Amino acid sequence: MILLQHAGLPPPKRPSSSPPMSVAARSTGALQLPPQKPFGQEASLPLAGEEEPPKGGEQDTALEELCKPLYCKLCNVTLNSAQQAQAHYQGKNHGKKLRNYYAANSCPPPARMSNAVEAVAAPAVSVPPQMGSFKPGGRVILATENDYCKLCDASFSSPAVAQAHYQGKNHAKRLRLAEAQSNSFSDSSEVGQRRTRKEGNEYKMMPNRRNMYAVQNNSAGPYFNPRSRQRIPRDLAMCVTPSGQFYCSMCNVGAGEEVEFRQHLESKQHKSKVSEQRYRNEMENLGYV
């Protein structure tokens, strides 16, 4: 080695100290294995965000037509913003009506309805169609107080929103106005009934006044009877004077109307006079007088 260094020649290469590689190891090192996937992703399973294609395409398209971004035709609710629409479509009322819709059509509901709520930049609010044309399975779902206020013409997305509306000032003001209108209508109807009754009484009194004037103008002689056309009952025929008045000779009392005269006949004074007269007649018949 010293001689080689002096001569300027490079030293010979020494063999490496690592053991020789076996044939199996060489063959393994020569093969290129594919990169392994992390644990849990060996099988091609669908992720949580992915959705399976819905079954019953016709029914899903009909349901998407019912559930518009700002109008839910299934619940008959008009929505004002995308946040309110999202809250409505995720609420209990919409879920219940959705289950009823699928039950009426005898089709299992999907796990998730796609494209139900979409972000709308400039929504064009359209007039909702009439509910009479829509008949899902021949079943009509009526709106409740938690869905719609008929007095204020307002729709709600949840019972909490409905409760807040019913406790607000606007609803209370509308309620007071409605009560005032109903009271005024009832008062006006009562006044109208009173007027009709009064007019009827005045109309009845007018012919009587005309008859009185005619009697005064057409009276001729002391034997004129203005009640000649009036029907006189048989039991009172002997108590009517030629002038048409009723007269009680026993009590020396007269009356112009039949009702007043009958009241006199049923009075205690008249009955006492009648009993006295009977007693006198009986005594005369017996010869005591």
UniProtKB/Swiss-Prot annotation:
Pfam families membership: zf-C2H2_jaz, zf-met
Region (Disordered): 1-59, 180-200
GO MF term list: RNA binding; zinc ion binding
Predominant cellular place of this UniProt entry's protein: nucleus
Highest taxon in the source lineage: Eukaryota
Ranges of compositional bias, category Pro residues: 9-18
Zinc finger boundaries on the chain: Matrin-type: 70-100, 147-177, 246-276
GO annotation, cellular component aspect: nucleolus
GO biological process: apoptotic process; DNA damage response; protein transport
Ranges annotated as biased composition (Polar residues): 180-191
UniProt-annotated location(s): Nucleus; Nucleus, Nucleolus
Keywords, alphabetical: Apoptosis, DNA damage, Growth regulation, Metal-binding, Nucleus, Protein transport, Repeat, RNA-binding, Translocation, Transport, Zinc, Zinc-finger
SUPFAM superfamilies: beta-beta-alpha zinc fingers (SSF57667)
Function: Acts as a bona fide target gene of p53/TP53. May play a role in the TP53-dependent growth regulatory pathway. May contribute to TP53-mediated apoptosis by regulation of TP53 expression and translocation to the nucleus and nucleolus.
PANTHER family (alphabetical): ZINC FINGER MATRIN-TYPE PROTEIN 3
Quaternary structure note: Interacts with dsRNA.
Protein name: Zinc finger matrin-type protein 3
